[in-house]
């Protein structure tokens, strides 16, 4: 089974950045978000994971930059939009901008009834981001705790969630390898598809994730590993085939 790869473009204050463990203030600046996204599209990406960090942290938004990327590149690549989607207005804006899929994080924990209604309405165009420390969920830009992972999944499964984007916060941006055990535990407890996020630092990490395909891990988000040139997207796509 092949693995779908989603190069990440995280946007803060109008720039493409990478964070360490999701912490505000730990940014490394990588320049223009549009140029970053275009680089990955030209290198063969079929999906882009586009994150508005300001919206996630409640420090504003980067809608203009995100809209430019979706408008200019949306006919060449599928875009998964994440960050600050927690009500009808922000969800509608993301979908109307042309996102193929929208990733809901904090709202899934703070407003389960709303989350259930949008999963029912939009189906597989809505994924739920599970940002995890141990077996505890992190909420609102990873600054607060949001409850037990598996209890939350039980509810989300019951309302028909079709995809989880699973991030081990301790691994994210640290180039220390993905949490294969966590990914396995999540995938084995749900019929939903699972996207792996956080910690991928070498091609062998992708090979390890690919081995989980038969239990439902069908995709992986690539962030710092690409920006730090640990490997090229072309090399990763070859492994993912």
UniProtKB/Swiss-Prot annotation:
Q: Where are the transmembrane segments?
A: none
Annotated Gene Ontology cellular components are: cytoplasm
Superkingdom, taxonomy of origin:
Bacteria
Q: Name one GO molecular function term.
A: 1-(5-phosphoribosyl)-5-[(5-phosphoribosylamino)methylideneamino]imidazole-4-carboxamide isomerase activity
Broad EC category: isomerase
State whether keyword Isomerase applies: yes
Key words, A-Z: Amino-acid biosynthesis, Cytoplasm, Histidine biosynthesis, Isomerase
Pfam families according to UniProt = His_biosynth
Pathway involvement?
Amino-acid biosynthesis; L-histidine biosynthesis; L-histidine from 5-phospho-alpha-D-ribose 1-diphosphate: step 4/9
Q: Where would you find this protein in the cell? A: Cytoplasm
Keyword Amino-acid biosynthesis included in the entry's annotation: yes
Give the GO biological process terms.
L-histidine biosynthetic process; L-tryptophan biosynthetic process
**Positions annotated as active site in the UniProt record:** 10, 131
The protein's matches in SUPFAM superfamilies, at most eight in alphabetical order, are given as: Ribulose-phoshate binding barrel
Query: What is the E.C. number?
Result: 5.3.1.16
Record's protein name: 1-(5-phosphoribosyl)-5-[(5-phosphoribosylamino)methylideneamino] imidazole-4-carboxamide isomerase
Q: Which organism is it from?
A: Bifidobacterium longum (strain NCC 2705)
The uppermost taxa in this organism's lineage are: Bacteria, Bacillati, Actinomycetota, Actinomycetes, Bifidobacteriales
């Amino acid at each position: 089974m092949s693995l779908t790869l989603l190069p990440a473009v995280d946007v803060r204050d109008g720039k493409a950045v990478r964070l360490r463990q999701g912490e505000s203030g730990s940014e490394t600046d990588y320049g223009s978000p549009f140029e970053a996204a275009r680089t990955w599209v030209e290198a063969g990406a079929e999906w882009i994971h586009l994150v508005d960090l300001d919206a996630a942290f409640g420090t504003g938004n980067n809608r203009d930059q995100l809209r430019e990327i979706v408008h200019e590149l949306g006919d060449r690549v599928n875009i998964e939009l994440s960050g600050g989607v927690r009500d009808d207005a922000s969800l509608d804006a993301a979908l109307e901008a042309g996102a193929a899929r929208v990733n809901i994080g904090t709202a899934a924990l703070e407003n389960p009834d709303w989350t259930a209604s949008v999963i029912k309405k939009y189906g597989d165009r809505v994924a739920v981001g599970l940002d995890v420390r141990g077996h505890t969920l992190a909420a609102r830009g990873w600054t607060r705790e949001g409850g037990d992972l598996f209890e939350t999944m039980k509810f989300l499964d019951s309302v028909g969630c079709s995809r989880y984007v699973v991030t081990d916060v301790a691994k994210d941006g640290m180039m220390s390898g993905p949490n294969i055990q966590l990914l396995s535990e999540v995938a084995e407890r749900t019929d939903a598809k699972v996207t792996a996020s956080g910690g991928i630092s070498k091609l062998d990490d992708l090979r390890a994730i690919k081995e989980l395909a038969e239990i439902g891990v069908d995709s992986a988000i690539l962030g710092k590993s690409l920006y730090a040139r640990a490997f090229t997207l072309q090399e990763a796509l070859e492994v993912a085939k």
